[in-house]
Swiss-Prot record:
A motif (PRPP-binding) lies at residues 99-111. The gene is pyrR. The keyword DNA repair does not apply. Regulates transcriptional attenuation of the pyrimidine nucleotide (pyr) operon by binding in a uridine-dependent manner to specific sites on pyr mRNA. This disrupts an antiterminator hairpin in the RNA and favors formation of a downstream transcription terminator, leading to a reduced expression of downstream genes. Also displays a weak uracil phosphoribosyltransferase activity which is not physiologically significant. It comes from Clostridium perfringens (strain 13 / Type A). It holds the Pfam family Pribosyltran. Homodimer and homohexamer; in equilibrium. CDD domains: PRTases_typeI. This is Bifunctional protein PyrR. Substrate binds at R41, R42, D103, D104, V105, L106, Y107, T108, C109, R110, T111, R136.
Amino acid sequence: MHLKASLLDENAIRRALTRLSHEIIEKNKGVEDIVLVGIKRRGYPLAERLSEFIEKFEGVKIPVASVDITLYRDDLTNVSDTPNLNDPKIDVDIRGKKVIIVDDVLYTCRTARAAIDAIMDQGRPEFIQLAVLVDRGHKELPIRADYVGKNIPTSKDEIIKVQIKEIDGTDSVEIYEN
């Protein structure tokens, strides 16, 4: 696997998240009843950052929760022989709320589908939207993101690597070839 290109640096990621924050506010006509739910691992810190930007623009703190979708994956046995199964409980009441799922990369849509299932098991939100930093195409399910930081068309042989400062010590999006 070798680096093909660096696609987003720290400044580009910050600009993308700033734009996504404005789009979320505009599309929802404000921030009332919005809950951001970040998919573990990298979706959660992105959701926290979106919440910070929205608070900066609107003066309102948006609740942020995380969801572990491990139990909801349809490829659980492909991930590991002994997967780490965590409680998928979301620590924010999402019933009747405008839930926005946040993730780093949208690829096949299977992770997004698992997150939707996990959220619906916690209660019935008013609606669910999806925000992603990168949409790389190759969807296998009829799911699309409502908010996209960057569309990056890829081949199935390419790998998108997202690094988030809170987890990886740096912010970047890179594309690799196998």
